[in-house]
């Protein structure tokens, strides 16, 4: 985790805009996990893991694209490997698009569609109003 934070810090100094997409396996906030009270000592929601994500989206200034446009709960991207967990939506939001601050204003919409499923993870789809230049 520390190596990735160092990498993000190094990239930030390049003064370019970046979007980092992937599964961080950390539910940062209470609304990113269904049963947060029971999960405070579980991997993926441990205080040091959440503090690491807080540092990335706080002190380091990166932006969580989903939370930029939605503060709703029950938006999860991963469920334990059993049908009942998914049926009851006992999920975690482990998947992120983390942006450099300059891209914040371009986020228009974000969603985690549960179908179709290609793995245990739902895709995080973010719409940007941004013209890509090469």
Spans of features found by a protein language model:
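Metal-dependent phosphoesterases centered on the DNase I-like endonuclease/exonuclease/phosphatase
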Residues: 2-90, 94
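A residue-level signal for beta-strand positions that form part of recognition/binding surfaces
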Residues: 62, 95, 107, 123
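Residues at the C-termini of beta-strands that transition into short coil/loop
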Residues: 66-69, 102, 114
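Short, solvent-exposed helix-loop connector elements
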Residues: 79-80, 107-114
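Hydrophobic alpha-helical positions that pack around
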Residues: 98
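Short helix-loop capping/hinge motifs at secondary-structure junctions, enriched
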Residues: 103-106, 133-134
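Surface polyanion/phosphate-binding segment centered on an Asp-His-Pro turn
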Residues: 111-134
């Amino acid at each position: 985790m520390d190596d990735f934070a160092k990498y993000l810090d190094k990239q930030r100094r390049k003064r370019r805009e970046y979007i980092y997409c992937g599964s961080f396996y950390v539910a940062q906030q209470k609304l990113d996990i269904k049963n947060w009270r029971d999960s405070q000592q579980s991997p993926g929601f441990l205080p040091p893991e959440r503090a690491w994500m807080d540092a990335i989206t706080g002190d380091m200034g990166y932006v969580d694209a989903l939370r930029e446009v939605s503060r709703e709960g029950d938006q999860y991207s991963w469920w334990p490997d059993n049908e009942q967990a998914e049926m009851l939506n006992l999920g975690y939001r482990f998947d992120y698009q983390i942006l450099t601050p300059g891209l914040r204003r371009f986020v228009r919409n974000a969603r985690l569609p549960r179908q179709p499923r290609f793995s245990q993870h739902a895709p995080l789809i973010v719409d940007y109003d941004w013209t890509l230049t090469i």
